[in-house]
Amino acid sequence: MQGRLSAWLVKHGLVHRSLGFDYQGIETLQIKPEDWHSIAVILYVYGYNYLRSQCAYDVEPGGLLASVYHLTRIESGVDQPEEVCIKVFVPRRNPRIPSVFWVWKSVDFQERESYDMLGIFYENHPRLKRILMPESWIGWPLRKDYIAPNFYEIQDAY
């Protein structure tokens, strides 16, 4: 079933795939990594000026990684927000997605956390570095194929 935003994107010739609706009735769309930045700018101009959250997850061991964006558009009033969920899937061998930091500044720490935990590289992010794990940490802890070390010694600050 095609939602309102999906119909609008089709009308304007923007490539995407409708994934239906979630349990709250929020439309979910899949965007290719190479199209994501331009579609993000278009969505911002169209009125989706609030990035509610960004997260990422490992779809399956050895499979794809996903970066998920929850966007909100408030046109008629605060009590009637229009929401959409965007999913961008990337291969785990070279997980690269254009950063939308320059579109929604609030994605800064969220993209950094996705990088730190899953190793998704957000191209053109101004400060893409580990945010939760020490810089010396090896691997991506939230990947399903991650093997946790038996021991990790945290160095003292002095």
UniProtKB/Swiss-Prot annotation:
<dbReference type="GO" id="GO:0009535">
    <property type="term" value="C:chloroplast thylakoid membrane"/>
</dbReference>
<protein>
    <recommendedName>
        <fullName>NAD(P)H-quinone oxidoreductase subunit J, chloroplastic</fullName>
        <ecNumber>7.1.1.-</ecNumber>
    </recommendedName>
</protein>
<keyword id="KW-0521">NADP</keyword>
<comment type="function">
    <text>NDH shuttles electrons from NAD(P)H:plastoquinone, via FMN and iron-sulfur (Fe-S) centers, to quinones in the photosynthetic chain and possibly in a chloroplast respiratory chain. The immediate electron acceptor for the enzyme in this species is believed to be plastoquinone. Couples the redox reaction to proton translocation, and thus conserves the redox energy in a proton gradient.</text>
</comment>
<dbReference type="InterPro" id="IPR020396">
    <property type="entry name" value="NADH_UbQ_OxRdtase_CS"/>
</dbReference>
<keyword id="KW-0934">Plastid</keyword>
<keyword id="KW-0150">Chloroplast</keyword>
<keyword id="KW-0472">Membrane</keyword>
<dbReference type="Pfam" id="PF00329">
    <property type="entry name" value="Complex1_30kDa"/>
</dbReference>
<dbReference type="GO" id="GO:0048038">
    <property type="term" value="F:quinone binding"/>
</dbReference>
<keyword id="KW-0793">Thylakoid</keyword>
<keyword id="KW-0520">NAD</keyword>
<keyword id="KW-0874">Quinone</keyword>
<dbReference type="InterPro" id="IPR001268">
    <property type="entry name" value="NADH_UbQ_OxRdtase_30kDa_su"/>
</dbReference>
<keyword id="KW-1278">Translocase</keyword>
<dbReference type="GO" id="GO:0008137">
    <property type="term" value="F:NADH dehydrogenase (ubiquinone) activity"/>
</dbReference>
<keyword id="KW-0813">Transport</keyword>
<dbReference type="InterPro" id="IPR037232">
    <property type="entry name" value="NADH_quin_OxRdtase_su_C/D-like"/>
</dbReference>
<comment type="subunit">
    <text>NDH is composed of at least 16 different subunits, 5 of which are encoded in the nucleus.</text>
</comment>
<dbReference type="InterPro" id="IPR010218">
    <property type="entry name" value="NADH_DH_suC"/>
</dbReference>
<comment type="similarity">
    <text>Belongs to the complex I 30 kDa subunit family.</text>
</comment>
<keyword id="KW-0618">Plastoquinone</keyword>
<dbReference type="GO" id="GO:0019684">
    <property type="term" value="P:photosynthesis, light reaction"/>
</dbReference>
